[in-house]
Amino acid sequence: MISGLLKKIFGSRNDRLIKQYSQNVKRINALEPAMQALSDEQLRAKTDEFRQRHANGESLDDLLPEAFAVVREAGQRALGMRHFDVQMIGGMVLHDGKIAEMRTGEGKTLVGTLPAYLNAISGKGVHVITVNDYLATRDSDWMGRLHRFLGLTVGVNLSQMDHEAKQAAYAADITYGTNNEFGFDYLRDNMVYTAGERVQRSLNFAIVDEVDSILIDEARTPLIISGQAEDHTDLYLRMKDVVPNLTRAMEEKDEGDYWVDEKGHQVHLSETGYEHAEQLLAEYGLLKEGTSLYDAANITLMHHLNAALRGMTLFHKDQHYVVQNGEVVIVDEFTGRLMAGRRWSDGLHQAVEAKEGVQIQAENQTLASITFQNYFRMYNKLAGMTGTADTEAYEFHQIYGLETVVIPTHRPMVRKDMNDLVYKTADEKHAAIIADIKDCAKRGQPVLVGTTSIEASELLSGLLDKESLPHQVLNAKQHAREAEIVVQAGRPGMVTIATNMAGRGTDIVLGGNIEKQLAAIRDDESLPVEEREQKAAAMKAEWQEVHNAVLASGGLHIIGSERHESRRIDNQLRGRAGRQGDAGSSRFYLSLDDPLLRIFAGERLRAIMDKLKMPEGEAIEHPLVTRSLESAQRKVEARNFDIRKQLLEYDDVSNDQRKVIYQQRNELLETDDISETITAMRQSVIAETFRTYVPAESVEEQWDMEGLERALASDLQIIAPVAQWFKDEPTLSDEEILERITKNADEAYQAKIDLVGDGTFHQFERNVMLQSLDSHWREHLAALDHLRQGIHLRGYAQKNPKQEYKREAFELFEGLLDLVRREVTRVVFTVQIRTPEDVEETAPHAEVQNVQYQHAGYDEALGEGEGAEAAGQQPADAGPKIGRNDPCPCGSGKKYKHCHGKLS
């Protein structure tokens, strides 16, 4: 009550903002006569003048009044369209990084030209984002005329464009494109192997058209790039034959080709083992004569040999996995349950498949993924336009930090929004809709019928056919054709049935749109100029008559065939009528069979109808019914908001990690010499290995010098006679020993550089680092995905799933960084680089096939929800408890206590 009183005295925040912006509009209007007096060349020269002034320290805010006045005049000259005062306010709202809610028909597309021009002056690029390729192309051509008139460059970013065309589009001052394409380009740019392959510049300023659709409706579905890893089936099969020919040593000191470290779950080849393996691989035609497993070109062979050895010696059938229906299925080592659908990484699963003689499946990996929330929050400044944002203002503020400002209409709104009519059955509702359409058609009033599904639109179309009523059906599939039809939906007596989103972004002009016909007359050079003007004038006069007739019939009539889950979508449908002060009306027809009513209010309304003994075909019409429906919609909207917020909270964890990995990649691509990074990695890995065998602040009796020497040689290929040093000089401190090992490693590293020269070796290091980062990041994405799918079950253990996810994801990430450090150090020391050609062999290349771009379903991408209502439920996979003497569920035939029971 008090807040309402204060609002009356001081006005709402929205009113105060509009008042402030209106002061600026007065300044812009005062500049209009001066702009009108300029020639085209002088007007165009203003762009360079603004750039110079901005470079000299003037802010974009200082330039705003003059720049907006220039755009208004250019709009008049290039497009024949003058920006209204309310459109100027909309432009300022967008420039301030807010959301402008403007009614349908108020010229949002034209409003976007104002902040786009002003922000393009900085030279950092502006992205104008729309919902489909058709609108991106249309707006870049249409509004591009204004920008090009003022000397700016305009690009359009479409799917299926080649690399050069994309780079050119992003290099332009203003780039139009779709949300999906901008997001995928960002992901692709973080998968390239040279800086020159990237297409995007820094993310400076984005203007999102239909911002509610992009930032809210599509925010539940992440963008995913996935693909099949390179097919090495043949290699796995041949490696399977190589491994049995190698002999196993029981202990590390014993003779043999390899020994198995069961504690560390690794297999290590001895020096004789490497030689024997090289000989066998040469016999099988896998290794070229005169080459070594240590050569740069043979890193893949080394990887496959290691996978085959591990698969053969460390993973046993009916203990670690079972073979079922021709597939290798992992057995959970703690529960003994089968883990269908899970696969080991690093080629291990394929090695086991080769061992068991089943079909080897190519790994389908997620290569990169991001949500729209996290992509758009990376822009330095974000703004949006829509006809309906006020209902979601809270979400825009919570998730994106964006304020919503409702822009006043240019002319007062006179559309008549009638109360909903609720019928008992769907058949009664459909009969009432047909009767309403018939009545409108008789009076020559155009009708737009909005449906929530293609099925519903086809049903109504069939009923209209039975009544022999001419009509057109639009389902959101062919955007370009739809736009043409929607434009003409305002002709007298025209009946159009459309799904809610069909033809969005295109205005319905009462009397039809004659712009195309007028353009054809103006461009017809076979006619004299005078005759062209006469023809155009006659066409306009004819259109005015039709326009007036439609207004007299009541303007466009909107019929909603059912309420949508979101009030915003209903408001969008209503907003198709009553544009720019035109007459119009809207009415929703509902039945108790509609999903929303059935779930939230059906029983109560049905009871009322039964009590009133309402005859068939009669409807309930009352503001109370409309209000209760809006309350039901609010509940659904709140639930959907919670789902999106939850997705974001989970994705924020991987987003922080994504930023770290992508930043490292970018530094690698932009730095010529990464030897400092490699040195820091090497020293960190050596120190960690050293402290494993020589703990800090420990006595000499606890030091394992022989173990340290072996670990340095086998894990890092660093040869340091540590045991001998200590024997010769017993007084050596642990710090001195570490210093010597580091010095030895530094000398060995420098010797490798001296062999081929700085440039060649540093390029090799970069290649190794990129490959390692990319492959481990892909595996990490899969691990996070698996973690997220099962994390909700932690709720049953009275743990917070979100906190658990954050903690475990952090541990996984630390493990990833450690793996990369160790792998890069080992490969740099192991691989022998003799010529620049060897470096070419190590160059990373896209090891994936059948790359797919998905805007995947939320449930598919997220797995199950967090399971907040955990108390009264059972875990999805909870089976009966296994007794110690029961057969083990892995299928081995042993008792549980002698099989997987040992592990738990």
Swiss-Prot record:
Disulfide bonds: none
Record-level GO BP terms: intracellular protein transmembrane transport; protein import; protein targeting; protein transport by the Sec complex
GO cellular component: cell envelope Sec protein transport complex; cytosol; plasma membrane
Membrane topology: Peripheral membrane protein
EC code(s) of this entry: 7.4.2.8
Record's catalysed reaction(s): ATP + H2O + cellular proteinSide 1 = ADP + phosphate + cellular proteinSide 2
Cofactor binding note: May bind 1 zinc ion per subunit.
GO MF annotation: an example: ATP binding
Region (Disordered) location: 865-887
Highest taxon listed in the record's lineage: Bacteria
Key words, A-Z: ATP-binding, Cell inner membrane, Cell membrane, Cytoplasm, Membrane, Metal-binding, Nucleotide-binding, Protein transport, Translocase, Translocation, Transport, Zinc
Comp. bias regions, Low complexity: 868-880
Stored Gene3D superfamilies: Helical scaffold and wing domains of SecA, P-loop containing nucleotide triphosphate hydrolases, SecA, preprotein cross-linking domain
Cofactors: Zn(2+)
Family per similarity comment: Belongs to the SecA family.
Name this protein carries in UniProt: Protein translocase subunit SecA
Lineage: Bacteria, Pseudomonadati, Pseudomonadota, Betaproteobacteria, Rhodocyclales
Protein's gene: secA
